[in-house]
Amino acid sequence: MRKKILTLTLALIMLIMPFMSTKSINQVNASEQIVDSTCKAYVLMDKDSGKVLNENNSDTRMPVASIVKLMTILLTLEKIDCGEISVTDKVTVSENASGMGGSQVFLDANCEYEVGNLLKSVIVCSANDSSVALAEYIAGNEQLFVKEMNEKAKELNMTNTNYENATGLPSTNQYSSALDVAKVLREVLDYDLYQEYSKVWLEDFVHPSGRTTEMTNTNKLSRFYEGCLGGKTGSTNEAKYCLGVGAKRNNLSLIAVALGCENSKERFSTCSEMLNYGFSHYENKVVFNQENLNDIKIKMQGQNEMLSLVCERESNIVTEIGKEIKVDLKFNLPNSLVSVKQNECVGSVDVIINGEKYDSINLLSSKDIKEPSYLDYLKRIQEDFIG
């Protein structure tokens, strides 16, 4: 079937900062120093696209302390999401898990705790004992869970990461990088349950015996930074002070990671500075959505009907505020169709920005249309003859 190609050219010209130079749409001045910090590595990333907006030593391997728990959290969230486990499942805590030390909620060995409460304590107060209890429940033992952690890291293209435990407690060959931390945090932030637990600032963790352990959120930005989606802290003598955090304002979602800071205050100030820079210099621009399909229809053979289309998703791009961009839409659609089912993919649209292909979105049928019968064809011939 022949394809017809429709090209629409849209000029999206933003006049807020007309003095800015025009660059290739994929070019970002990622090496520009945007924070005054002594941290060893940092990265600022657009959450939706994964584009790095700014970085320093972001691929350097280094210890990240409890930020390792982001992968423990991610694997637990995935198991909950796919139905393998539930937040109400009961976990019997082993002697090994209860004796982890470091940051903890002081779990009672041989007692049962719900998955949801254990996960919350990992997210809120970085509980080592809860991390190991979840690892043992999910995989049978911590080392098997660590194997899953490293497999997931490989899947996410975290090329500078190796896990040796589920907690981030010091281990000889355990490391990650600022960029890899941003990659795993990007995945974690997609879960509503994570964001829900991340908003907890102060809460009592209730044990089966009735005693309580007070949990205080280790991520101060969850309370004091507008639009904070969640994050993870980490600190050891080797890793110093680390933080990965996400925030959203005006439809723009950013991730900031700072590793190897000299003190706790610096990790929060460094990430805040990066986020502030991002929100003041970048915007999330819609370059294709349903409105672009208002005048795009497909003829149905043998019928007095035109098929309307639905976009599978919209397309956005993060670009510098005030930057001029040119958007071309190249529609790849059949000239006509005989029949179609609702939500069936019937074509696609390529989004081309400044002459470079940026995205491709499937276009779906808006409804069912059956193939016309013999009588329908006769009726159509009659109508055309009379008309």
Predicted regions and their residues:
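Sec-dependent N-terminal signal peptides of Gram-positive bacterial secreted proteins and lipoproteins
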Residues: 2-27
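Polar/charged alpha-helical tracts
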Residues: 3-5, 26-27, 31, 294, ...
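Active-site-adjacent loops and short helices of periplasmic peptidoglycan-processing enzymes
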Residues: 21-179, 183-192
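Hydrophobic alpha-helical segments, especially transmembrane helices
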Residues: 3-5, 70, 249
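Domain-terminus/edge residues, biased toward the C-terminal soluble/receptor-binding domains
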Residues: 158-159, 170-175, 179-387
